Amino acid sequence: AGPTFVNADTFDVGTRNVNKPQNVVFSTDGLRMFVVNNMNPTSNDGDRVDQYHLSTKFDITSAGTIQAFKIVKNEDSAPRGIAFSASGFSMFVVGDAGNEVNEYTLQTAFDLSSNVSLENTFTISQDSNPAGIAFNDNGTRMFVVGFNDGEVNTYSLATGFDLSNGSGTEVRHINVFSTTGQTSKPNGIAFNNDGTMMFVIGMGDDDNVNKYTLESPFDLSNGSGTAVTSVGSFDLSNESTVPRALTFNEDGTVMYVTATFESDILSYDLDAPFDIGFTDPILS
């Protein structure tokens, strides 16, 4: 069976004055949720990252009002993807207005109510519409989805989670992986915990989650000993016309999807960790 869509667990960000959610991630303990907001219908501060406190870890229905937020429009007016360093002291926001990844330093881990400052800006020159972003576990590889060209670009970081790109901290583009065989409009990206599975959301003509297995963890070079294999896709179109991003809880038994036009964060229960099946969703 495929994932079970749990309608009762849908989180309506529209009721929190958020109109176009782009991406969602959690703190490592699951008690904070961060939503990239590209447009706010009643004010001009819509290009921001919103922080919610969850009273129960990874339970999005336990979120209260917006606890804190960071306006990022001064760096990029079209924020799309978000990721944090493992420690939570660095936040990375990718935007397709400036085609860049902006790195912010947080005074307190996973807390936007603390002092948050822009640390580095890294320009993405491989695709004109960068969207989703992810890292391997130690931050020495960064993955950026190219919506325009249908690809995932991999970058090597000399220092983990450091985009300063100077002497000793070089950031290099090392390969490109095409998703066009599965989706021509990739947007969000996520990995399982050990990097042997990759999930890419397709948007528009193919509203689905595509699953790949990686022979070598977090390695998309797709050569001998590093094969990347497409194993199937899961249809999201019944729940969202524009799914943009996805993430999982800590053990991969719940999948969360950002439904942009519906202004929702959707929740799916999985029968086994990171097992999205390849059938239509079960409704509950």
PLM feature segments, named:
Residues A1-G2, Q51-T61, Y104-S113, S156-N165, ...:
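Short loop/turn segments immediately following beta-strands, especially the blade-tip
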